[in-house]
Amino acid sequence: MAVASAAPGSIFWKQLLFSLLVLILFCDACQKISLQVPSHLRAEALVGKVNLKECLQSASLILSSDPDFRILEDGSIYTTHDLVLSSGKSFSILLSDSQGQGQKEIEIILEAGGKKVPKRHMKDAVLRRTKRRWAPIPCSLMENSLGPFPQHVQQVQSDAAQNYTIFYSISGPGVDKEPFNLFFIEKDTGDIFCTRSIDREQYQEFPIYAYATTADGYAPEYPLPLVFKVEDDNDNAPYFENKLTVFTVPENCRTGTSVGKVTAIDLDEPDTLHTRLKYKILQQIPNNPRHFTVHPDTGVITTTTPLLDREKCDTYKLIMEVRDMGGQPFGLFNTGTITISLEDENDNAPYFTETSYTVEVEENRIDVEILRMAVHDHDLPNTPHSRAVYQILQGNENGTFKISTDPNTNEAVLCVVKPLNYEVNRQVVLQIGVLNEAQFAKAVNSKTTTTMCTTVVTVKVKDHDEGPECQPPVKVIQSEDCLPTGTELLGYKAVDPERGTGEGLRYKKIQDEDNWFEINEYTGDLKTVKVLDRESTFVKNNQYNVSVIAFDADGRSCTGTLVVFLEDKNDHPPQIKQEELTICRHDKDYVVLEPTDQDGPDNGPPFQFILDNSASKLWTVETRDGKTAILRGRQDLDYDYYTVPIQIKDRHGASATHILPVRVCDCTIPSECRMPSKLSREAALANVFLGKWAILAMVLGSVLLLCILFTCFCVTVKKTVKKCFPEDVAQQNLIVSNTEGPGEEVMDANIRLPTQTSNVCDTSISVGTLGGQGVKTQQSFEMVKGGYTLDANKGGGHQTLESVKGVTDTGRYTYSDWHNFTQPRLGEKVYLCGQDEEHKLCEDYVRSYSYEGKGSVAGSVGCCSDRQEEEGLDFLDHLEPKFRTLAKTCVKK
């Protein structure tokens, strides 16, 4: 059993060393075996083979004491990596039996090849006879051998058989490797046998090793390498790499044009007669005429004629054969199908189905289709070789017609794009030609003499009353600038084509931007209604446009444009658009004047600049290039504003005097001048206005002031009125109380009522009205004969029905007097109400309210309004049950 090797230092290696140590200590030694090996051993090289069964019959564990070697189950010794043996090397094979037979050890001694003798000792070397090594015998096996099996292959013999009893064995592919058990050897005779037939296409050769060992496992010979080569048998027929192959070739191609190359495969041994292939064409479909041939050795298919015509046959099929053995009749063969498609060429010119066409169209019709023409083309449809391109060769010098191709039907579509005039031309003859998108390629056998087919189209124009004509569409007339009003100008003239004159036509102006003209309805002439001005913003490039419509009696019309070209007149003097000039003393002591002239160049520069006598004392002006001038102070001027009168003339003397505002400033550039400009100051004054928020603030302020004055007036008037309590005051009163909590117990004679305080009186401002008079809040109350007043010391407002008259009382009693008066009476009445509830409930009584107070506008408010009696609280004795909750609330619990 083979054991995988482990790297030194690993855990597995440590365990392996421990196992070897145990085996060495407790195992018996078998016979030593010496093996002759070369001094250099490659990795996985076979060192030798040992008969392990002679030492231990059944070994379950096979180990090597040296990690440079590994031992197989059959006793073969292999290296684990490349080794260089300078001298002998020894190691042990350790065998262990799990059935209890013990452990065995086989010592292996490797003897390296002969030592090299230094050159200086070459003469001292003794010539010795070396032992002849058993040489391999060349051997081969026939593929697909019929036997009988086992079939004798070869015999190996070792010269050591003269001195030892030699046993032979083999290993390698076919023995202990795939394919297993193909070869075996008789260990006594060395005869090697083959057990079955071999397929060379699967195994070309078998490299195996033969071993010669003694009974005790000694190997007196090196392993003998044997190579059994399998001789090829022609058992594989060639076949085409692709069963169906498609080639393409242009039609009408030259003779000898390569169509394609076919390739076949033969699995037999290369470079032998078994793989020497020959190609030939067995059949061409269709067969007549024969167009193709194939090279027998290379398989290249070529054309044999230039007469390939796709329109006759677009596809050919070739049945081809490939045969080995150089094409001999006894060689193996196979067939395949080759499809050759012909590529279309533009070898057929399109042609019209009709030689001539006739069509009618009404005059003045445009963008209308008048005719469709079909063509035939034998080339491949929907390709550049068959798509038609039409041309109008003659008769369309004015561009009246347009011809195009319908992409769906390939027809020619003839259209009218400009109106036809029956009065000018009643019939038009067109010559139309057709070509393909692709260039024409004439075939060898073609009889075509021209590549373009033509046809004739006769277009007859039908008469139609189309109305007036405005020809030309734009008419130009010249006029002087500044032409006065009332001047007549030649207008636009239209023509009726039916009559050849403009008689009976009417004219109307449809566009006149600045309304300069009026038009004569019958003649179309213009008359000025404004002075013509070339410098107007409506004039572009000295031209002013007027659009005119001409119409006949039937309402048919045409439109024309009249361009009035205005000749320039020197009617505008030079102007300076610079509103204010700034001289920065720290930059330069002058300013540049740049006048403009609205007139044309002939009435413009050069300009002449003349200072007024008053201005020439402080200023000088210098003309630079006839278009600009420099204004400079004669001396250093103070920082201030200046006005400089200056006259500017053009080349013809038209002039104007300008007052130039100039500011001399302490700055570097004009934008840094801190001195506000005259224009900005004037603009600031002109732009001052009241905004909506300012107006609103003023209105609200006025209203607030009026309110304050009115309040002060009212307060002053109230202080001057004598406050008194009239004798005829009403006996019905309402007591204001904000108390929401319960009162004392019913049996308690003292009923404490809360007071209501407010600081509003301190501000002397009315907080509510009753009957149109101001009412102030109360601080303390007093009851006198049913009336309630405020304490005068507190300054509170009266809260009675008489308050509607504006009468207030400063109060006659204090709060304690009022409290002492009402407390015992309320308690007594509540008690009596509870004692005689049944009787008092069923009493039906009437209260008199004969006197309600002088001037009162309201009726009585209850039975408690009787102020004539001081003890006027008897009504509390007759409270109904629904008032019990109110009574309990007023009693302190």
Curated annotation (Swiss-Prot):
Keyword flag Cell division: no
Post-translational modification: Isoform 1A is phosphorylated on a serine but isoform 1B is not.
InterPro entries, alphabetized: Cadherin-domain_protein, Cadherin-like_dom, Cadherin-like_sf, Cadherin_CS, Cadherin_pro_dom, Cadherin_Y-type_LIR, Catenin-bd_sf, Desmosomal_cadherin
Signal peptide: 1-29
CC terms in the record's Gene Ontology section: adherens junction; apical part of cell; catenin complex; cytoplasm; desmosome; intercalated disc; lamellipodium; membrane
Extracellular side: 133-692
Residues with attached carbohydrate: 163, 398, 545
Expression (tissue specificity): Epidermis and weakly in tongue papillae.
Keyword set includes Methyltransferase: no
Bilayer topology annotation: Single-pass type I membrane protein
Residues with PTM Phosphothreonine: 383
Name of the protein in question: Desmocollin-1
Annotated source species: Bos taurus (Bovine)
